[in-house]
Amino acid sequence: MALYLSSSRLITFLSFILLLSNGFSSSSSRPSIHHRHHLDNHNYKDALSKSILFFEGQRSGKLPPNQRMTWRSNSGLSDGSALNVDLVGGYYDAGDNMKFGFPMAFTTTMLSWSLIEFGGLMKSELPNAKDAIRWATDFLLKATSHPDTIYVQVGDPNMDHACWERPEDMDTPRSVFKVDKNNPGSDIAGEIAAALAAASIVFRKCDPSYSNHLLQRAITVFTFADKYRGPYSAGLAPEVCPFYCSYSGYQDELLWGAAWLQKATNNPTYLNYIKANGQILGADEFDNMFSWDNKHVGARILLSKEFLIQKVKSLEEYKEHADSFICSVLPGASSSQYTPGGLLFKMGESNMQYVTSTSFLLLTYAKYLTSARTVAYCGGSVVTPARLRSIAKKQVDYLLGGNPLKMSYMVGYGLKYPRRIHHRGSSLPSVAVHPTRIQCHDGFSLFTSQSPNPNDLVGAVVGGPDQNDQFPDERSDYGRSEPATYINAPLVGALAYLARS
């Protein structure tokens, strides 16, 4: 460890090593703004099971015999036919009937990362989590089966959003959109490469043939992403914006994809790529949020392990960048904002996605630091792995009900949770109960009603409360009441860790 610390940092570390159980200590540290909300201990194991079950409610395609979310039925069975390709399967991203490839790929990467770091703690839920990943990767393999072409979206978002109908009934156009060498999409291609590479690690031991198939496709897709550079939203703006525009550009996905291929292959080609292109791809730009759009922070945490554990000294800067992110989200930091009740708050719409992704990164980085027997540095202060775990736990506890409203923001967990989530399938009677088709506009009578959703989308985590810890539980409030796959994906890893501990 001392080999990679400056003398001043080594002294700082030795001075603070006895603080490992208490975390952040500094004369300049600020008092916590968190309020305590007394609740019984959370059942993280139950929450983990439900967080994985949620993905079955988002499935598109022909459902398997072991489908547990039984109010759902087959849907989207002709997806891809508009361009004579098979794009059946995959996930609906949130509460609509769209298949957006960009967030689906990120969801897949984060589910895979959750299993890579904490899958050994999942026990009986591990097969279900692998099924959730495979449902996505099977689709991503279809979407990348043609050379130098990626099918990135199924459905017309504007027409889809003008209807309120079950996925089993949808009659809106299932338009297919793609990127190719003439209309590149380095961002979505880089994310798909990351997803396939990460998933290849998950299946390496249990299904070597499938794992190798995923990895070889990841290599091909990354080559396409790097060779034909450009953001996918440049050529597909009317179709993907403002829903999933690539606001942060494509550079972060190239770094992210290379980082995952480095991890999956251990091929020096990708390490050399990162060394040569890291600065150009924004490795040292300051970011303090991690999401389906911006992967810089995730790449830094992932690459920091190469320095911390594998002792790749040329990647030391990624440990420093990872520390900078950690420092930026600590309660009391000038760049962090927390609600009066203690929830990390990044923005008004779908804030829980940042809560779950940050919590996962804190726990993952704590794992790396512990393995390397070191700490994070915030100026002259030390932040221990224990401190990072404590912050992450408080965020997850808030999500599960440790908040001023005593409300769980996970559907089906606890006694008080959102009952009117912004989700078409959940808010309309199931096909089994109401076999007659519900037409495009007919569903809006239920959309505007105050009745609870007839089908619980168990495990779904909604966008969450506002900056004052308030949550109206209104179906029309999509920013706070809509679930999404990329909210749940990193939470799976966090809950796996907490369930064990």
From Swiss-Prot:
Catalyzed chemical reaction(s): Endohydrolysis of (1->4)-beta-D-glucosidic linkages in cellulose, lichenin and cereal beta-D-glucans
Active site per the UniProt annotation: 96 (nucleophile), 422, 473, 482
Subcellular location as annotated: Secreted
One biological process term in Gene Ontology: cellulose catabolic process
The keyword Transport is assigned to this record: no
Residues annotated as signal peptide: 1-29
Keywords (A to Z) from UniProt: Carbohydrate metabolism, Cell wall biogenesis/degradation, Cellulose degradation, Glycosidase, Hydrolase, Polysaccharide degradation, Secreted, Signal
Domain of life: Eukaryota
Location (main, coarse): secreted
GO molecular function annotation: cellulase activity
SUPFAM superfamilies reported for this sequence: Six-hairpin glycosidases
Top EC class, one word: hydrolase
UniProt-listed Enzyme Commission number(s): 3.2.1.4
GO cellular component terms, semicolon-separated: extracellular region
Family classification: Belongs to the glycosyl hydrolase 9 (cellulase E) family.
Identification of the protein by name: Endoglucanase 1
Native source species: Arabidopsis thaliana (Mouse-ear cress)
Lineage, broadest ranks: Eukaryota, Viridiplantae, Streptophyta, Embryophyta, Tracheophyta
